Amino acid sequence: MCPNFLGVGNETGCKLSDLTVTGYATMSAGQFMLKPLTATGTAESGPYYWVDIPAQGKKGWFLNAAGTSQIPGGAESVSLAAGRAVWCLGKGLKLVPAGMVNESLVAFTSNSGTGYTAMGNCTPVDITLDKLTVSGYATMSAGQLMLKLLTPTGTAESGPYYWVDIPAQSKRGWFLNAAGTSQIPGGASSVTIAAGRGFWCLGKGLTLNIPAPVLD
């Protein structure tokens, strides 16, 4: 996930206190765990737990799941830079930022070479796969980035789709395989990524570019 929203603290980022959590939780006491990541994909700080225990009058971010360990300086002391990724754990829960929704281009950089990076459509409108492009240095062969769309429960809904950029073969775009020999039926424009829908990406050092949304 990536808190890249305008009007949240400022245009360069937000504070943990700007984020709240809603929805049904399968974790005990309604906790949601969040870890800010460095540019290389390692944990920068945290984890921080969202605790919502009405019987104990507890609601907010803590350093433990029981809500007994306060964050030094409070949640407002934890900064999340614009475009910075965070790992989250809490099936069925929604992380809700304060302020206006994003209206500008967003660039996610995949940091994990052995696992997947959690990303998503953080714009308020549905977009299609053909609107997404990939740039940057790749450790994967032929510059591929693999993307899997997820259901609300976190399972793969469709894909994987591969970004292929092989100038010698005049291939550039999304395909069903890494070699770029299998076309997506109906093309990339037929694959819709709903507003707020998450997806997994694999391709260390590659940047997935999401265009600014077209708003009515």
Regions found by a protein language model. Name each.
Residues 1-216:
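N-terminal exported-region signature
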